[in-house]
Amino acid sequence: MSKKQGKPEYVTAISNRKARFEYEILDTIEAGIELLGSEVKSVRLGKASLSESYAMIHHGQVWLENMQITPYEHNTLDTLEPKRSRRLLLHKAEIMRLQSKISEKGLTLIPLKAYFNKRGVLKIELGLARGKKLYDKRETIKNRDAKRQLQQLRKQY
């Protein structure tokens, strides 16, 4: 008999593919996001982008900047600004911890992926990151190529 398939832990709606290449991720944290209904529908359809977006702390709240959400095509209400600031939902202790870490030189908050959890709620995975230098990026490419060659050799034997 086959096992009953359960719901997956989460379904990735969108991901920031360049984030792990351009930044060294030191820590990750999960945050909720405050959206309107039509924006959630657009994200479910995959019409959103996290590239070139970042999070910042302003007056004790975390805001996600430059996240592109294309307006829902069947929306009858006023259309919203596609790249408006969106509030992220975190506990105050988490915000204070992030604030202290960001005050260090060279650290920033970037969204790594957006996904729907088991309950169907949209979550954003934020990464506390430090920008990579050009030689670090080259090293990442070399390591990736070496792993790929090893996999190809393993397939042959």
Swiss-Prot record:
GO terms for biological process: trans-translation. The keyword Cytoplasm applies. GO terms for molecular function: RNA binding. It comes from the Bacteria. Belongs to the SmpB family. Coiled coil: none annotated. It comes from Chlorobaculum tepidum (strain ATCC 49652 / DSM 12025 / NBRC 103806 / TLS) (Chlorobium tepidum). Required for rescue of stalled ribosomes mediated by trans-translation. Binds to transfer-messenger RNA (tmRNA), required for stable association of tmRNA with ribosomes. tmRNA and SmpB together mimic tRNA shape, replacing the anticodon stem-loop with SmpB. tmRNA is encoded by the ssrA gene; the 2 termini fold to resemble tRNA(Ala) and it encodes a 'tag peptide', a short internal open reading frame. During trans-translation Ala-aminoacylated tmRNA acts like a tRNA, entering the A-site of stalled ribosomes, displacing the stalled mRNA. The keyword Cytoplasm applies. It holds the Pfam family SmpB. It is found in: Cytoplasm. CDD domains: SmpB (cd09294). Its main location: cytoplasm. This is SsrA-binding protein. Keywords: Cytoplasm, RNA-binding. One of its GO terms (cellular component) is cytosol.
